Structures are given as structure tokens and as C-alpha cells.
Amino acid sequence: MSFVLSRMAACGGTCKNKVTVSKPVWDFLSKETPARLARLREEHRVSILIDGETSDIYVLQLSPQGPPPAPPNGLYLARKALKGLLKEAEKELKKAQRQGELMGCLALGGGGEHPEMHRAGPPPLRAAPLLPPGARGLPPPPPPLPPPLPPRLREEAEEQESTCPICLGEIQNAKTLEKCRHSFCEGCITRALQVKKACPMCGRFYGQLVGNQPQNGRMLVSKDATLLLPSYEKYGTIVIQYVFPPGVQGAEHPNPGVRYPGTTRVAYLPDCPEGNKVLTLFRKAFDQRLTFTIGTSMTTGRPNVITWNDIHHKTSCTGGPQLFGYPDPTYLTRVQEELRAKGITDD
């Protein structure tokens, strides 16, 4: 059975922008061949974020990225391309695992630098039991070297180090970004940062991003010691209310001059140290007008409304990731990654 699943069975039609994948396959793809992911993101103008997880799978969410208008059928084509890329990664992972097992068997059976010399023949005669090296006055042998990477993976890793992820040619006048340490041709990354001040590989933001969230909104925060979230029962709960009155779209919005209705959204965080850290980052994102935008609702299909802007909030106390609630063991870590991609950090 393939590790790559098209979607979770419980998602239904609302998950057409989601892909479910086994953790080993995603980790292999994102760590061994990040240039492929970067090229997919750039060609299809999408972001790919981890939206939920279980013990053995990730739920990936694809979202349009870049200036409007989005390409027709953009998410469908991006999702199809991602599924194909994941299937290729799955095959390569299985092949690498088989090669690793074979090399491990040879290493165990050989016992030296030339295992082919020990494949046949009787075992060597021993005159007496061997003593530990220290007991014979000899220094202990050095620890064994780890098995080398399979040749294909080693060549691909070396190629990635010298290949620009933007132009896919050999890096010319290498420029390494300070925070994430990804390297590019100087000319390629200069042009890319003029379009969007973020690393094309990982999305790490460079500079301060200001969004188009309506300016007349308020972020209200209160704490409820009696409201307990699953997995955080020894803490109280931070309750966040976002309140927006009706208004008129400005020049930075999809339909300037068109009215949009008001809305109120409620979100929950555990009142623990990590939850309060996320609250501070949420305040920064709200002040930089990044938490919401104006567009078409993904749930109702209604246009010209205030919608979330790819910073996931827990709008339910319970129900797990499928119902936007708790428990969700890695949510606080994931949402900090989403915020970091928009340049919102605690430094």
C-alpha cells in the first residue's frame, strides 16, 4: 500500500487543497531534495504547510501564493504535481532503505575493510581467548565509521550544494541568506527578493511584511482559568476575540469600493509559557495586518468577506485537528513556523 494518500477519508470535499503523506516520505523529500519542492512552489505559486498530523502521517495544506490573479486550476494542478513528487520520493526512499539494509548486512558479515575476503572458508583458528585492547596494553580501536551514503544520494547531495534552486544551474557568485543559510546565485536571489522578501526555499521572511487586513479591527484578549483544553488541563485558557465592523474595500483589496460585512472570530490558546509566546506573536501579526485578508470564504464560497490569512488558529476547544481544536500536540510549534514564514519571530 502506498504511503501517499490523496486525502483523509473524513475530510470530504473541503480538503481539495490538502494531501496526506507518511512522515518518513515527507521528511525524506524535504531534507534530501528540497530543490524539487522549491521548484514546485515557484512553478505553481503555492505554499505548502503542515496543517495537522498523527503519529505516522502529516496533513499538508496547499495555499495560493503571490500576487493575484491565481492561475486557473492552480491548486488542482499543484496538488497533482505534489502527489507525483511524493510518489517519486517514496520510491527513492524504499530504494535507499534497501541499499542501506544490504550495506548493513555486508558490514556485519565482513568484519573488515574487504568483506569479499570473508565470504567463504572456515573461520580462523584462535589460540586463546582475545582480551580487551586495554588489557593487552594497546589503545582501544577507533569507533567504526558510519556506512557511506548510497552513491546516487551522495551525488545528488553534492549536486544540490552546487546547484542554484532558482535557475537550477551551477551557482554563480554564491549568496547565502543570513537566517536560513540557503545559497543561490547572487543575481537570482537579488531578483527574487525584489518580488518577495522571503527565501524561495523555506519561505523565511527577510524584512517586515505588512498585509491588507482591514485597519478597523480589534484584537481582544482575556483569560479563563476554568476553561481547560485537552492536553493542557493544568493550565487555563487564553481566549482571543477578533472583531471587525463592516467596511469598504480599499485599493489594496481585490475589489476596491465594494463593501464587506463585519465579523467576529474567537480562538483559543493554552495559558502556558509556549501559549503565551504564541499570543505575543499573534499580536505582532495582527499589528502588521497579516492575520486576516479579504477574499472568498473557503467554507461558504462567499466573495468579498474577511477570511483567515494562512495563520492557523484553534477556533474550537475540542475535536482535534479535524475540527480545528485540541488535542493537537504539535500545533504550537507549527503555527510558529507559519508565523516565521511571514517574518513574525520573537527576536
Swiss-Prot record:
The keyword Kinase does not apply. GO terms for cellular component: cytoplasm; nucleoplasm. Residues 113-157 are annotated as: Disordered. Gene3D superfamilies: 3.30.390.130, Zinc/RING finger domain, C3HC4 (zinc finger). InterPro entries: Deltex_C, Deltex_C_sf, Deltex_fam, Znf_RING, Znf_RING/FYVE/PHD, Znf_RING_CS. Pathway: Protein modification; protein ubiquitination. Coiled coil: none annotated. It is found in: Cytoplasm. It is an enzyme of class 2 (transferase). Regulator of Notch signaling, a signaling pathway involved in cell-cell communications that regulates a broad spectrum of cell-fate determinations. Probably acts both as a positive and negative regulator of Notch, depending on the developmental and cell context. Functions as an ubiquitin ligase protein in vitro, suggesting that it may regulate the Notch pathway via some ubiquitin ligase activity. This is Probable E3 ubiquitin-protein ligase DTX3. The lineage of its organism: Eukaryota, Metazoa, Chordata, Craniata, Vertebrata.
